[in-house]
């Protein structure tokens, strides 16, 4: 059974202030399994939001709601400071964060203004993941790499339980990276057949690295449009994707379902059958409340088991 989550209405996905808070409350009150947050420093026109700041805000306000970072531009940050951020979040909300990471090379300028070289993002990511995994045990580490040199680096207390790291990307290098360093893969713009093939290859890469793929969890980010007709559902989806990516919608359309919740669920079912354990929906509709209702209905259709009630108490109360 796949967990069905949706992106929080923050940052570049468009709601602010009281409207965003109300939408997050609707997500928490619904049968949606988890909330997702995205990450950009300065994308295209300068847009963005810090995924770990937003994750901390969500996790401390809603005591039982899990949060998936899907995904975080890890090569644009220093891995030791990220390890501290993750450890701090784990203290506040143990076991409720899933940490997805990716290169974020779609906007070369964003990478450059963060002081990174777009040509070396992959190697930088590999070193960052090695450091994150080593620091997650709470032991002192030394590291001598191309980008990072550490002597007796340590982060305590270590996250307990360990925060799963899901590696995103469509390239062969990303697939190898997921097997070598991740706890699963995060796909986007992929067919169900390709999804199944990639997960098998990740298992092979994990075994080649001396790791067991047992327990790996693979996820899918997917843009979806909801509305009373397919035409009505397509319009807000197309507008949102054009605005975010600054590109035409048509090349993405075959991977981006729209229509009724039933039509969206029918589109997603083959991914669940292909081994997807978490579907992260970027939901678009003409009315703010419609995306939450649409995703909740998709969840009911794909995973009909009811959820336990949640509390709205603040974590510090």
Q: PLM features: what roles do these ranges have?
A:
Residues 1-317:
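Active-site-adjacent structural elements that line small-molecule/cofactor binding pockets in enzymes
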């Amino acid at each position: 059974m796949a967990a069905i989550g949706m992106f929080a209405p923050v940052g570049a996905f468009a709601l602010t202030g009281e409207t965003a808070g109300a939408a997050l409350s609707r997500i928490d009150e619904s049968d949606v399994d988890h909330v997702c947050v995205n990450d950009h420093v300065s994308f295209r026109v300068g847009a963005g939001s810090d995924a770990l700041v937003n994750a901390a805000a969500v996790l401390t306000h809603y005591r039982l709601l899990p949060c998936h970072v899907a995904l975080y531009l890890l090569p644009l940050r220093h891995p030791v400071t990220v390890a501290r951020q993750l450890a701090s979040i784990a203290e506040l909300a143990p076991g409720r964060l899933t940490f997805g990471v990716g290169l974020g090379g779609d906007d070369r300028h964003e990478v450059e203004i963060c002081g990174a070289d777009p040509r070396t993002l992959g190697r930088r990511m590999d070193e960052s993941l090695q450091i994150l995994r080593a620091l997650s045990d709470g032991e002192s580490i030394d590291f001598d790499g191309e980008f990072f040199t550490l002597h007796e680096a340590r982060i305590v207390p270590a996250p307990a339980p360990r925060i799963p790291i899901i590696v995103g990307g469509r390239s062969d290098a990303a697939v190898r990276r997921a097997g070598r360093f991740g706890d699963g893969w995060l796909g986007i713009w992929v067919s169900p057949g390709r999804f199944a093939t990639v997960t098998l290859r990740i298992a092979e890469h994990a075994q080649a690295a001396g790791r067991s793929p047992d327990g790996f969890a693979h996820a899918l980010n997917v843009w979806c449009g909801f509305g009373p007709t397919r035409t009505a559902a397509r319009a807000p989806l197309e507008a949102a994707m054009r605005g975010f990516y600054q590109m035409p919608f048509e090349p993405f359309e075959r991977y981006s379902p729209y229509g009724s919740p039933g039509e969206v669920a029918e589109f997603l079912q083959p991914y669940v059958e292909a081994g997807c354990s978490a579907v992260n929906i970027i939901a678009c509709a003409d009315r703010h409340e419609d995306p939450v209702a649409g995703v909740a209905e998709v969840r009911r259709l794909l995973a009909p088991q009811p959820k336990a009630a949640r509390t709205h108490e603040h974590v510090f109360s």
